Amino acid sequence: MDMKDHGVSEHVDPLMEDIDRYGLYKHVVELEAYGITVVPPETMRVDEEFVGRLRNAILRACERRNGVEITDYQTSVLAREDAGRNSWDLLEEDEIFVDAAINPVNLALVRWLLGGSAVFSGQTWIIKGEGYPSLNLHSDAHGIPPGGGHIAHTCNASWLCSDYEDAADGPTVFVPGSHHHARATLPHEEDLATTPFK
């Protein structure tokens, strides 16, 4: 028996149909358990060509906005300030950014976390070069006061456009389950060398 087929909730039933249609049950469970999931391109219903177009659009936008040249995304060296400067508001740069933002699989997971009234509030790139210093642990849920409740107020939905397999690739550090704390990172938890999260 599928609950969604019985009109149980007018707001949840369509979302459950999307979760079923796109085969996202595993990813929903990972979001609930760990606070993160990695959805492969085939599940996102995109191919390597789409990912390449998205990556190239990011690189061209960075070049135009910052007056730099990125000849090869795997070997070019960029100063940190050039890689991250002017990185916001990408939708008007290239249609591929709109396609990535409204990808139905992506939206199904965002709506799972935030509800049907989720609002798209920002888009940016993150370009990491070799030797860039690490960021401290932090929360991207800016402006949410302590005691904001055990609900998701915000989420990040990122497209990975290059290899992201180990520390050499400059990965994002994530604390599994930290979303259950319902608070931002505390000062004594921020430093990667001394954080109690291991």
Question: Which ranges hold each PLM region?
Answer:
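Short, structured patches in soluble enzyme cores that scaffold and shape functional sites
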Residues: 124, 139-141, 159-163, 174-176
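Non-heme Fe(II)-dependent double-stranded beta-helix
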Residues: 2-34, 39-144
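Double-stranded beta-helix
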Residues: 164-198
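Conserved hydrophobic/aromatic beta-strand scaffold that supports enzyme active sites
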Residues: 36-38, 136, 156-160, 196
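A short beta-loop-beta micro-motif enriched in histidine and acidic residues
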Residues: 142-154, 192-198
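Short, conserved beta-strand element in jelly-roll/cupin
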Residues: 146-167, 180
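Active-site glycine-rich loop that binds ribose-phosphate moieties when present
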Residues: 136-145, 159, 181, 187-192
